[in-house]
Amino acid sequence: KISNEIKIAEAKYQKQLEELRRQEESKNNNGKNNGNGNSSTPTGSGYLMKPINGGTISANGYYSSGKFHGAIDYAVSTGTPVYAAAAGVVMSTANLSGSYGTYVVIRHANGLQSYYGHGTYGSICVSPGQTVSKGQQIMLSGSTGNSSGPHLHFEVRVSPYTYNGYATGYGQDSRVNPANYM
């Protein structure tokens, strides 16, 4: 029964993503041919917006110790609004005591997934399966989970989605540098 429910939910997500993909291609192309026929490869194109107003970058892929981090951390005050970096479908949300703490994961039409971690407990204002627009508020920043202070953990992954806790750089799992898509 659960397997069937998962298949139904996945089909629903795929339908929503396909509609978003069509809308984005229409908006991006404006009737023009971009030369390669593929408007969904956004390297450095501004596909993603900065998910938070203000804040300073406290980690950009690596911690100050040199250890790989795989995300951009924006140091901001607790309660700062966090926004969807691009249109997509909310895949999951949770309020965990460890790891990402309060987090949201959004799948985008081009195959990217964006992760927003360490939000304020109870501040998530979207639900799994919900379609969100670029710039829509999804939660408030905080310091939940494995966090050393108030900030937004902003991580981006590409399909197929894998995670390697021992990775020492981008390319060793599905995490990519978010700056390449902003």
PLM segments and residue spans:
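Alpha-helical oligomerization segments with coiled-coil/rod-like character
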Residues: K1-P42
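Zn2+-dependent peptidoglycan hydrolase active-site motif and core
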Residues: K67-G70, A84-Q130, T144, P150-V158
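Short glycine/threonine/proline-enriched tight-turn/helix- or strand-capping micro-motif at secondary-structure
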Residues: G54-A86
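Short acidic/polar mixed-charge low-complexity motifs
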Residues: T80, N110-L112, Q172
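Acidic, glycine-rich catalytic/binding loops that coordinate metals and/or anionic ligands
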Residues: Q130, E155-M182
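Terminal peptide-recognition signature
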Residues: I57, Y74, G88, G135, ...
